[in-house]
From Swiss-Prot:
Residues given in the record as substrate binding sites: 150, 182, 224-227
GO CC annotations, alphabetized: tRNA methyltransferase complex
HAMAP family: tRNA_methyltr_TrmB (MF_01057)
Keyword entries, A-Z: Methyltransferase, S-adenosyl-L-methionine, Transferase, tRNA processing
Pathway(s) it belongs to: tRNA modification; N(7)-methylguanine-tRNA biosynthesis
Catalysed reactions, semicolon-separated: guanosine(46) in tRNA + S-adenosyl-L-methionine = N(7)-methylguanosine(46) in tRNA + S-adenosyl-L-homocysteine
Region (Interaction with RNA): 152-157
Name of the protein this chain belongs to: tRNA (guanine-N(7)-)-methyltransferase
Catalytic center residues: 146
Domain of life per record: Bacteria
Enzyme Commission no: 2.1.1.33
Length: 245
C-alpha cells in the first residue's frame, strides 16, 4: 500500500463493515495500490497529473484530463469497474473506506486492465471539502448508500442538504448527480433534498413525468448481484438524476 494511505477509524456518515480482506484482495492492495490508490490530502487534487496515463486523458499536451466522475461508496466495485470499462473516455475518482472493497476493486482493475480509475480510501466528505475544486467534476455517482433504516439513525444518512450543496458547487454546469437506492423512504428523502438545491434540476421532470420525479435506470448502471436478488424478492429500485444548472 502506498505511503500516506490509511483506512480511517472514525465513524462519520458511514460504519466500517465487518469483513476479512482476502488473500487476493490483499495482493491487489500491494500490487495495484501504488498506481491506483491516492493518499488523502488537504490540498486540491491535480487531475492532469493524476490521470496522465488514463484512457480518459486527451493527450499529453492537452491541459484537460478528460471528464471526471466522483463515486462515493463503491462497495465491492462491481458497478464501478463495469462503468469504467464502458466509458474509457471518462476518469473515475472513487471513495470507499471498506478495505476489502478497495482490494476487490483494485483486483478488478488488474484483471480488466482498467486505467481510468483512482481510489481514495478516506471519508468522501473530507475528500470533497479539501481535494475537489469548485466546478471540477462532470458527474457524481452515489449508488445504494446505507439507508440507516431506524428513524433515530436517519440523521446519519449520507445524502443531506449540506453534502448536496457541496457537490453541486463542485459540478461543472451540465454535470450530473446520479443516486440509486432500494429503500423507498430514502429515495423520497433523496428526491426532496436534491429538489431543494437551487443549483440542480431534475432531469426526469419533463422527459418522464409519469415516474413522479424518478428517472429510468441509466444504461450505464449495471444490475449487480445484490440488486438482482432484491428484484427477484419484489424489492424496488429508485434512480434519481439531477443536472447542474
Amino acid at each position: 500500500m502506498p505511503e500516506g494511505v490509511a483506512f480511517p477509524k472514525e465513524i462519520k456518515s458511514f460504519v466500517r463493515r465487518a469483513g476479512r480482506t482476502t488473500t487476493g484482495q490483499a495482493k491487489a492492495l500491494e500490487d495495484m495500490g501504488p498506481q491506483f490508490l491516492l493518499p488523502y490530502q488537504t490540498s486540491a487534487i491535480d487531475f492532469i497529473a493524476t490521470y496522465a496515463d488514463s484512457t480518459g486523458a486527451r493527450g499529453n499536451n492537452d491541459i484537460n484530463p478528460g471528464p471526471v466522475i466522483l463515486e462515493i461508496g463503491f462497495g465491492m466495485g462491481e458497478a464501478t469497474a463495469h462503468i469504467a470499462a464502458l466509458m474509457p473516455e471518462k476518469n473515475f475518482l472513487c471513495c470507499e473506506v471498506h478495505e476489502p472493497g478497495v482490494g476487490a476493486l483494485l483486483k478488478r482493475i488488474g484483471e480488466q486492465g482498467l486505467r481510468n480509475i483512482r481510489i481514495v480510501a478516506h471519508d468522501a466528505v473530507e475528500v470533497i471539502d479539501h481535494m475537489l475544486p469548485l466546478q471540477s467534476l462532470d458527474g457524481v455517482h452515489i449508488f445504494f448508500p446505507d439507508p440507516w433504516h431506524k428513524k433515530k439513525h436517519n440523521k446519519r444518512r449520507l445524502i443531506q442538504s449540506a453534502l448536496i450543496a457541496k457537490l453541486a458547487a463542485r459540478l461543472k454546469v451540465g454535470g450530473y448527480i446520479h443516486c440509486a437506492t432500494d429503500w423507498q423512504p430514502y429515495a423520497e428523502q433523496i428526491l426532496e433534498v436534491l429538489s431543494k438545491e437551487p443549483l440542480l434540476k431534475n432531469t426526469a421532470t419533463q422527459t418522464h413525468p409519469e415516474l413522479a420525479g424518478y428517472a429510468p435506470k441509466p444504461y450505464y448502471r449495471p444490475l449487480t448481484k445484490f440488486e438482482n436478488r432484491g428484484i427477484k424478492l419484489g424489492h424496488g429500485v429508485w434512480d434519481i438524476v439531477f443536472e447542474r444548472v
